[in-house]
Every structure is written in C-alpha cells, then in structure tokens.
Curated annotation (Swiss-Prot):
The family this protein is said to belong to: Belongs to the stxB family.
Record's protein name: Shiga-like toxin 2 subunit B
Primary gene name: stxB2
Quaternary organization: Shiga-like toxin contains a single subunit A and five copies of subunit B.
Native source organism of the sequence: Escherichia phage 933W (Bacteriophage 933W)
Localisation: Secreted
A single Gene Ontology CC term: extracellular region
Pfam families: SLT_beta
UniProt-reported outcome of changing residue 61 to T: Complete loss of cytotoxicity
Length: 89
C-alpha cells in the first residue's frame, strides 16, 4: 500500500513539474464559452479552462486587479490550463 501511495504521489509531482509558467500579469478579460469552458486573457495571450472551481477565483482576481500566473504544459495562446498561481504583487 505504501509503495502504491508513493507511486501515485510521484506521478502527481511529475505532472505538476511539467507545467511551465506561461503568462504572468493581470487578467485583461474573461468570458464564458458555449462549450462550458472559461477563457482568460493574460499578458496578451488567451487560455481556457474547464475547471469550474477556478472560474470564481479568476473573476475575483480580475475584479481586484490581482496578478496571476497561468501554468500549463503547452504555453501557446488558445491552449488550455488547469493550474493558476495567484500573486500578491
């Protein structure tokens, strides 16, 4: 059981390690999409997410002018993301 737990923990750490910092800045705009995804524009690039738990947090960050860092394994504009870092600067 312990070996299986460690293997899962290592796999999760490996996946998170692959997520690069794609864009850092204030959210320029956000919108809901017809396919139930949510798009934000940061640092001149648009990224979408299907994680509903991130949407109210991203909207709050936009309204308060908080800086965010979008993290993804693909950093091309128009790509998806599942991780965001909220910064206090």
């Amino acid at each position: 059981m312990k070996k299986m737990f460690m293997a899962v923990l290592f796999a999760l750490a490996s996946v998170n390690a692959m997520a690069a910092d794609c864009a850092k800045g204030k959210i320029e705009f956000s919108k809901y999409n017809e396919d139930d995804t949510f798009t934000v524009k940061v640092d001149g690039k648009e990224y979408w997410t299907s994680r509903w738990n991130l949407q109210p947090l991203l909207q709050s960050a936009q309204l308060t002018g908080m800086t965010v860092t979008i993290k993804s394994s693909t950093c091309e504009s128009g790509s998806g993301f599942a991780e965001v870092q909220f910064n206090n600067d």
